[in-house]
């Protein structure tokens, strides 16, 4: 499945939020949209539709989800009682690639997605190579025993980096075992900050 592999700095500046750590660093240095005239350039006022589109794109790029898949997640969120926007972000948080990232097994969601697709991750002991898999309470996410011998994972444990990692409250991390458990459902406030989900709801409600 195709993924955006372009310059994260340019996208981060266009969206006004760092979609990766690298994007955050670039945005801190150049906190204005890309363009040859720099920060002093006068730009057209963005329409309501433009703001809604921008917010949807922001969430998509942060979580690394393609348009068609993002639309399916939104439609699934609509079936839940309560606030659709909040459930949209909760469903994005429950993606397996995001959980691998939140547990500290990867430094970016793109890397986490790669670990999943390459077969390094198990769910309840079974190899799962689908990044969009939705985790449930009680499930254990771990690095495959065969993969733990790889230098990347050995360094992750031996360097102490994983032991220092702070997983969110809805996940319980076991650094020594390269595993984690889903102990609760994520809440709206557990999602990535800086996303106005109501604008996304308005975009799809046009």
UniProtKB/Swiss-Prot annotation:
InterPro entries attached to this UniProt entry: Ribosomal_uS4, Ribosomal_uS4_bac-type, Ribosomal_uS4_CS, Ribosomal_uS4_N, S4_RNA-bd, S4_RNA-bd_sf
Annotated S4 RNA-binding domain residues: 94-156
GO biological process terms on file: ribosomal small subunit biogenesis; translation
CDD domains: S4 (cd00165)
Pfam families associated with the record: Ribosomal_S4 (PF00163), S4 (PF01479)
Keyword annotations of the record: Ribonucleoprotein, Ribosomal protein, RNA-binding, rRNA-binding
MF term (GO), any: rRNA binding
Leader peptide range in chain numbering: none
Entry GO CC: small ribosomal subunit
Biological function: One of the primary rRNA binding proteins, it binds directly to 16S rRNA where it nucleates assembly of the body of the 30S subunit.
Family the entry assigns: Belongs to the universal ribosomal protein uS4 family.
PANTHER family per record: 30S 40S RIBOSOMAL PROTEIN, SMALL RIBOSOMAL SUBUNIT PROTEIN US4M
Subunit and partners: Part of the 30S ribosomal subunit. Contacts protein S5. The interaction surface between S4 and S5 is involved in control of translational fidelity.
Record NCBIfam families: PRK05327.1 (NF003717), rpsD_bact (TIGR01017)
Protein name: Small ribosomal subunit protein uS4
Species per Swiss-Prot/TrEMBL record: Roseiflexus castenholzii (strain DSM 13941 / HLO8)
Gene name for this UniProt entry: rpsD
């Amino acid at each position: 499945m195709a993924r955006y592999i372009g310059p994260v700095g340019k996208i981060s500046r266009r969206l006004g939020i760092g979609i990766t750590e690298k994007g955050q660093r670039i945005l801190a240095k150049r906190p204005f949209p890309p363009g040859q005239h720099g920060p002093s350039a006068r730009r057209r006022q963005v329409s309501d539709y433009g703001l809604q589109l921008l917010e949807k794109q922001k969430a998509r790029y942060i979580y690394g989800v393609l348009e068609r898949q993002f639309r399916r997640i939104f439609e699934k969120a609509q079936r839940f009682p309560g606030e659709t926007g909040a459930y949209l972000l909760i469903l994005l948080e429950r993606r397996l690639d995001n959980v691998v990232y939140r547990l500290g097994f990867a430094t970016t969601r793109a890397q986490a997605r790669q670990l999943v697709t390459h077969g390094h991750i198990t769910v309840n002991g079974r190899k799962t190579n689908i990044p969009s898999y939705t985790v449930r309470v009680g499930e254990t996410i771990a690095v495959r025993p065969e993969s733990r011998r790889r230098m990347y994972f050995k360094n992750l444990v031996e360097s102490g980096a994983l032991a220092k990692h702070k997983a969110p409250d809805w996940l319980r991390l076991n650094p020594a075992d390269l595993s984690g458990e889903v102990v609760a459902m994520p809440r709206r406030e557990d999602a990535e900050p800086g996303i106005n989900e109501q604008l996304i709801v308005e975009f799809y409600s046009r």
